Amino acid sequence: MIYSTTETIPGREIAEIKGVVTGNVVQSKHIGRDLMAGLKSIVGGEIRGYTEMMTEARNIAIQRMVEDAANLGADAVVGIRFTTSSIVDGSSEILAFGTAVKLL
C-alpha cells in the first residue's frame, strides 16, 4: 500500500476514489513517564517518554488507516493528515485520515 501526504502519487494516475479512510488510537499516559514529565517540566527539555509514546501511537493510527483502505480495495491513500486531541485527562487521541484511491 502506498500512502502519502501529497494529493497525487508521482508517475501514477488515480483511476478511482474509494473514499475517506481513518485510523485512530487513544493513548493514555504511563505513571513512570508522568513522573519524569513532571521533572522535565521543572528543568525544561524534551519529554522523550511522551515523544516515543506519540510516535508509536501515530504509527498505529497509520496502520489502521491503511487497513481501512485495503478493506475498500484501494492501492493507495493520498492527502494524509493527522490530528490530535485530548479525550480525557491523561489521554490523547491521534487520528490519521486520507483519501483511499485505486491507481492505474
Swiss-Prot record:
Alphabetical list of PANTHER family matching this protein: UPF0145 PROTEIN SCO3412, UPF0145 PROTEIN YBJQ
Entries under InterPro entries matching the protein: UPF0145_dom_sf, UPF0145_YbjQ-like
Pfam families, sorted: YbjQ_1 (PF01906)
SUPFAM superfamilies: YbjQ-like
Name of the molecule in the record: UPF0145 protein VIBHAR_02090
Family membership: Belongs to the UPF0145 family.
Naturally occurring in which organism (per UniProt): Vibrio campbellii (strain ATCC BAA-1116)
Positions of disulphide bridges: none
